[in-house]
Amino acid sequence: MDNLIQKMSEIYSDLHNSNNLIHCLTNAISINDMANAVLSIGQSPFMADNPREVEDVTRKSDSLLVNLGNITDYRIESIKKSVRIANENNIPITLDLVGVSASKLRLDLTLDILKNHTITCIKGNYSEIKSLFIKDLSTKGVDSQKLEVDDVINCCKNLHEKYDSIIVATGQTDIVCANEIYLLNNGDDRLSKITATGCVVGSLIACTLSVSQSIKACVLAISMMNISCEMVDKSVGLSSFKLGLYDNLSRIKWEQIKENIDAKKVES
């Protein structure tokens, strides 16, 4: 764990000494929250999704986020263009599998992207990761089914071996898997009562990957989000909780992350 903490400290420092351009191809439901999250940790969001401009924007970016929520034909065209440009220019890509467990269109798009391109990080909740692993739909909605952690770890390991991507599975325990596996147990149940918080995690991962294309960068991004929400007063309502989360994201110090992180490395 000492190596994890040391590397996360370096990534945190690099992140806060940078102002990288993060190209987010996302949905109308989460776009504002994601842009604010990127800004809150000192990076610059660019939310372009017009197929006529995305190649130029991606080419200038330091990281690309592809979010499959509320997908449209228009954005599918943009996604395919941006992913190609990112690969050609060694720009890290975070692919957030929003809704792939409920939509054949999204699952087929994901499989097509993974067949033809290299993805730095594949992120989804337990159900979405399981659906990608079995290549089939598994639920009527976008929230996780009650899957066992060990089952999801097995899915993550197999997906990492197949696609050589960092795999992030979010749930009660967050799983981050590459050549090593970390279980993260920070967080707050209130996150599940606010829309787009999972999408925000994806945008934070895109930010940390812009300075380090590593599993530790993903652990840092998730921990920043989860520890920030833990620091919000337990007595406040959901609107105040959301505001407090963004306040904490913008002010969280490395020492707070180091002191509060609940991470466990498991045998891979």
Curated annotation (Swiss-Prot):
InterPro entries: Hyethyz_kinase, Ribokinase-like. Coiled coil: none annotated. GO terms for molecular function: ATP binding; hydroxyethylthiazole kinase activity; magnesium ion binding. Belongs to the Thz kinase family. Substrate binds at residues 47, 196. SUPFAM superfamilies: Ribokinase-like (SSF53613). It is an enzyme of class 2 (transferase). Catalyzes the phosphorylation of the hydroxyl group of 4-methyl-5-beta-hydroxyethylthiazole (THZ). Pfam families: HK. The keyword Kinase applies. Its EC number is 2.7.1.50. This is Hydroxyethylthiazole kinase. Pathway: Cofactor biosynthesis; thiamine diphosphate biosynthesis; 4-methyl-5-(2-phosphoethyl)-thiazole from 5-(2-hydroxyethyl)-4-methylthiazole: step 1/1. GO terms for biological process: thiamine biosynthetic process; thiamine diphosphate biosynthetic process. The keyword DNA repair does not apply. Keywords: ATP-binding, Kinase, Magnesium, Metal-binding, Nucleotide-binding, Thiamine biosynthesis, Transferase. NCBIfam families: PRK09355.1. The lineage of its organism: Bacteria, Bacillati, Bacillota, Tissierellia, Tissierellales. ATP binds at residues 123, 170. Its cofactor is Mg(2+). It catalyses: 5-(2-hydroxyethyl)-4-methylthiazole + ATP = 4-methyl-5-(2-phosphooxyethyl)-thiazole + ADP + H(+).
